[in-house]
Amino acid sequence: MTDKKIAVLLPCYNEEQTIEKVVRDFKRELPEATIYVYNNNSTDRTAEIAASIEGVVVRNEYRQGKGNVIRSMFRQIDADCYIMADGDDTYPAEHAREMARMVLEENMDMVIGDRLSSTYFVENKRAFHNFGNRLVRWLINKLFAGNIKDIMTGYRAFSYDFVKLMPIESNGFEVETEMTINALDKKFNICEIPVQYRDRPEGSVSKLNTVKDGMRVIGTIFRMFKNYRPMVFFGLLSAVLFVLGSVGFMSVFIEYLQTHLVLRFPTLIVATVTILASIILFSSGLILDIIIRKHRQNALLQINCIKK
């Protein structure tokens, strides 16, 4: 791996308490790597401390949010392998070399540092975070036919191909969810390795808002489900409307058979419109599914060409 270019990516917002240790840990484990600290409008000494360490590249991203930071990192940095971690010292750098090896020698496109199979539920004392991780994992694996153990971990390794073909739309913490879904949809090579998670040191505060960011993650899942599985998404909506419309129509039709009169014109009109709406939704889902399949084929061909 010594002839390969490795980049360590550390997005940071107010991490003055931990950033020096995190940087030095990664320098120790991957001395050949270039370490990039992206400061995201920190109001403390994060950028100053990182810049004081020899060999560290410090850049600023003024658009607030982790997704904005990672988008800029992916656009601006070229490397054979990318290691991404948080600047809060919750992910041990000792796993970084093995993660890089799996990208460079085993042709993995994404190596996920799986916290949930090791110490996460013991170290993390925030019950709603634990519940949220389980819920997101269940949703994504069900909706996108995956088998990922840790969807929202911030500790990952990427190939050059994945980084340059990943269209990041998210602005905030939902970016990890977006990357995982995109990797599943485009059939990138994915693997997971257990990593020892440790809670933030005393005095270090999490930037994650459990409710607000949790809702963003759930919204991202359903937005991407609509975009990547339109036939299923619109088909389900169509089925619901068709059943409702049919129930209303049949009630009017049965009355007509009994009395030879249409006694409830408003119900008939609503039922007919509902059934028509269900047909339109089904047709839309079918058309979008054809478009998405073609787009997916083009993306896979592009990946194949790059891998040559």
Q: Predicted segments — roles?
A:
Residues N14-R28:
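Short, well-formed alpha-helical segments that are part of the catalytic scaffolds
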Residues K5-A7, T34, E178:
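Cell-envelope/extracellular polymer assembly enzymes that use nucleotide-activated donors
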Residues N39-A47:
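A conserved acidic beta->alpha catalytic loop
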Residues T2, S170-N171, V175-K308:
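Hydrophobic helical membrane-anchoring modules
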Residues D3-K4, E32, G55, I77-D80, ...:
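Active-site acidic short loop of glycosyltransferases
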Residues E15-T18, S42, P92:
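Donor nucleotide-sugar binding loop of glycosyltransferases
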Residues E61-Q76, C81, A93-F173, T177, ...:
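Acceptor/aglycone-binding surface of glycosyltransferases and processive sugar-polymer synthases
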